[in-house]
Amino acid sequence: MNPKYKPLFEPFTFKSGVTINNRIAVAPMTHYASNEDGTISEAELDYIIPRSKEMGMVITACANVTPDGKAFPGQPAIHDDSNIPGLKKLAQAIQAQGAKAVVQIHHGGIECPSELVPQQDVVGPSDVFDNGKQIARALTEEEVENIVKAFGEATRRAIEAGFDGVEIHGANGYLIQQFYSPKTNQRTDRWGGSDEKRLAFPLAIVDEVKKAASEHAKGAFLVGYRLSPEEPETPGLTMTETYTLVDALGDKELDYLHISLMDVNSKARRGADPTRTRMDLLNERVGNKVPLIAVGSIHSADDALAVIENGIPLVAMGREILVDPNWTVKVKEGREKQIETVIKGTDKEKYHLPEPLWQAIVNTQGWVPYKD
């Protein structure tokens, strides 16, 4: 190994007591590869195994905690005990490569396509209309409480399946973020109507997940939370609301906050100094309370090292690990110059990508670097 990259390979111990071998994580990525019923497929295992080698931690594709939370075809499910045997295979496949296995738990809310949810009954914090037609309905208070409980039950299943932790998916415009955002939450009950009330749902889920972890986990079990710091729309989340959120999450004894960005160096847009990066601002705000994971357009070993040298303790990669599953192996062996940055259509087999994910990469220009 090139000695300058040693900081990437130092172990890290979370508050919960879970220790990872290095500072590098696989970011959660949708792969469209689970079986239709949400159980884990062989294609999914074939995809995850090479990407787990020499990783500190692997965060899985998001798994829906209720049937009406399914946001993608081929999404893994964690809403029923019948999901546990497949999830156990997934956890073991990751752990056999030496990485800690973390399952991301999720509800898509109004982002769920109607054809994927029972009775095409799409739900969210508030009613949603498109050209006068209702396309999603507001959850009742009882339904909100049941979804909170479902996150706890999903955590129990993750523990029974042998995972080392869960990541609460509070990012990317899905249900948890929908409840916090003034754009999507127009409720006037205890789940909305003010900044404080809009915060109630994310915090209730954190409390429920932490409670399930303390009740069911026999050893160390980590709980992380992923968030998106800003929304482009007005009304929408700005850095001001994000500060309020991370302040509250920072008091919850979480193992980490995973800051979901397309570019780790992107600067604040509203509610904070626009000359500074969101990562710097958030690390300054809560980094002394809870470790942050940085993600977004990190490709080279130098990109990853720059994150660590900037005071962020953990780095995750998504698209780059689709392109080069052996990224960490190469850096560890001093072969960082051999890291690949583009998927070649002529070498399809070597990438171990499930067919639906391969098609998404080929057909979505500008998402993952690709050439025929």
UniProtKB/Swiss-Prot annotation:
**Under which main EC class is this enzyme filed?**
oxidoreductase
Alphabetically ordered keywords of this record: FAD, Flavoprotein, NAD, Oxidoreductase
GO-annotated molecular function: FMN binding; oxidoreductase activity
- Is NAD given among the entry's keywords? yes
The family database entries (Pfam families) matched by this protein are listed as:
Oxidored_FMN (PF00724)
The EC number(s) given in the record are 1.-.-.-
**Statement: the UniProt record of this protein carries the keyword Flavoprotein:** yes
Residues in a coiled coil are: none
Q: What family does this chain come from, according to its entry?
A: Belongs to the NADH:flavin oxidoreductase/NADH oxidase family.
PANTHER family, A to Z: BINDING OXIDOREDUCTASE, PUTATIVE (AFU_ORTHOLOGUE AFUA_2G08260)-RELATED (PTHR43656:SF2)
What is the designated name of this protein?
A: Probable NADH-dependent flavin oxidoreductase YqiG
- Native species: Bacillus subtilis (strain 168)
Q: Which lineage is the organism of this entry classified under, starting from the top rank?
A: Bacteria, Bacillati, Bacillota, Bacilli, Bacillales
Gene name of this polypeptide? yqiG
